[in-house]
């Protein structure tokens, strides 16, 4: 019995410590949620599958390829990243290039993205070697001239007026010679529910 009395205060202290730790954990999670980090959702990730694509000569125009009603059913399906594996940039290797894109051509890529109606701050990010025109639901949202081996040049928040539940991202990648690369992702912020 004496032994039990000696252990009782230690048990209470340990219980208080565990309770304190448990109460502190939700506070850290709430702070992370308030900062928005926990609410960023990836709608389309790097190296994603399901892209339709077509390589064209540099000067070839493909009218309306970025429009939602454009028929790409005859185009092949591919996986991002698109590019060459013999270039001088760190991403021009067999681990990051999933679909070939020939040097001295342009590549047209399209992918459908479903977003919830409450999606906010829809953001397109990625890398292109050399240049790109980025479209969202047929609207040009960014023109990029990134040059050789400049990572992260594609970075744009889509205007709210361009958003819908079923969305189309389309990109025309342009090559300036030596090597090619195109890979991107789409994220959005999911609003937190008020309690």
Question: Language-model segments: which ranges?
Answer:
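Extended extracellular/luminal ectodomain segments enriched in beta-structured repeat modules
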Residues: 104-107, 115-123
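Secretory targeting and sorting signals
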Residues: 1-31
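Accessory carbohydrate-binding/adhesion or oligomerization-edge regions at the termini
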Residues: 14, 27-90, 111-114, 127, ...
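Short, surface-exposed beta-strand/strand-loop-strand elements in extracellular ectodomains
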Residues: 131-141
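Solvent-exposed loop/turn segments at secondary-structure junctions
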Residues: 129-131, 147-149, 175-177
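Extracellular beta-rich ligand/substrate-recognition surface
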Residues: 91-107, 143-150
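Short proline/glycine-enriched turn/loop motifs at strand-loop junctions of beta-rich domains
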Residues: 119, 127-132
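Short histidine
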Residues: 144-162
């Amino acid at each position: 019995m004496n032994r039990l009395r000696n252990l009782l205060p230690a048990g209470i202290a340990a219980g208080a410590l565990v309770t304190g730790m448990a109460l502190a954990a939700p506070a850290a999670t709430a702070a992370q949620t308030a900062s928005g980090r926990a609410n960023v959702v990836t709608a389309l990730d790097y190296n994603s599958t399901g892209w339709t694509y077509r390589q064209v000569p540099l000067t070839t125009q493909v009218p309306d390829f970025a429009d939602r009603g454009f028929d790409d059913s005859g185009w092949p399906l591919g996986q991002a990243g698109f590019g060459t594996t013999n270039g001088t940039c760190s991403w021009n290797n067999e681990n990051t290039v999933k679909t070939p894109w020939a040097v001295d051509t342009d590549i047209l890529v399209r992918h459908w993205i479903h977003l919830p109606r409450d999606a906010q701050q829809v953001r397109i990010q990625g890398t292109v070697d050399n240049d790109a025109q980025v479209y969202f639901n047929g609207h040009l949202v960014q023109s990029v001239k990134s040059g050789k081996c400049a990572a992260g040049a594609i970075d744009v928040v889509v205007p709210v007026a361009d958003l819908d539940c079923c969305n189309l991202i389309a990109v025309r990648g342009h090559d300036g010679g030596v090597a090619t690369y195109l890979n991107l992702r789409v994220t959005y912020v999911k609003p937190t529910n008020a309690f």
